[in-house]
């Protein structure tokens, strides 16, 4: 790839996704763009860049999505996950017993493993909170990643990344060479496409936002914009999780590190007097995160006759 084409592409990614690349990451861009032009049958990178310069929004969106990072796994960083499940989550539950409502947001969720892992932890702690209003939202810039997350279907390699045999059998149903998320877990989680540079209009308040190994790819000014936005939709003393050893220089403006907890920060709730806007679950036709809900895949198949009863029970509310 020519230097001018590389520079054009990294500027394109910066403007449309906020990601910061430099010359040391040339091979990452080169590999991803080579896969894209092969998949889309472009003769060369130069031909693709020439078309991008015309300004096709649809093509720009496709290129940006093809560059999205998808490194994820279930129960990622086991020590961090166990600390969340066994220490922080019980405290969050205790603090919400009066309202009986919990909201979680996996931001930059890729193909859904992180959001489902939150649901796994909740499932383990459901004794006494079975009738609570519980919802886990997962968002990502990649529509392909979101489509996979919505299916809740993973191959053998994917489920073995972070899960032991007992957990696989507890949270999945075997379908040939794949594993499908069980209905009781699936009903807790919703996925939507969201570009982290887009405005965010919602009056939903999140108890926990998980944004692990995502902000490190953004330019510093975009990191600050994103943290300012998400801190505005957190509950008082809401929790933010970053990646293990992830350093974000502007984090202290909006969050403070929780002593004794890896990667966990408490929201300072700067500017809580801001006006509340639309509820994410009811607003449509917006350029913000508030998008029309997706149609869930049919999970009531003949192969799984017990699934219908699980859905009819209606234990979990959106």
PLM region spans:
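Conserved beta-strand signature within the Rossmann-like core of class I S-adenosyl-L-methionine
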Residues: 236-244
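A short glycine-rich, Lys/Arg-flanked "PGG" loop and its adjoining helix->strand segment in the class I
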Residues: 224-236
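Conserved SAM-binding loop of SAM-dependent methyltransferases across substrates and taxa
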Residues: 111-129
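Extended basic-aromatic, gly/pro-enriched interface segments that bind polyanionic ligands
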Residues: 127-210, 214-218, 222, 248-249
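Core SAM-dependent methyltransferase catalytic element
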Residues: 253-317
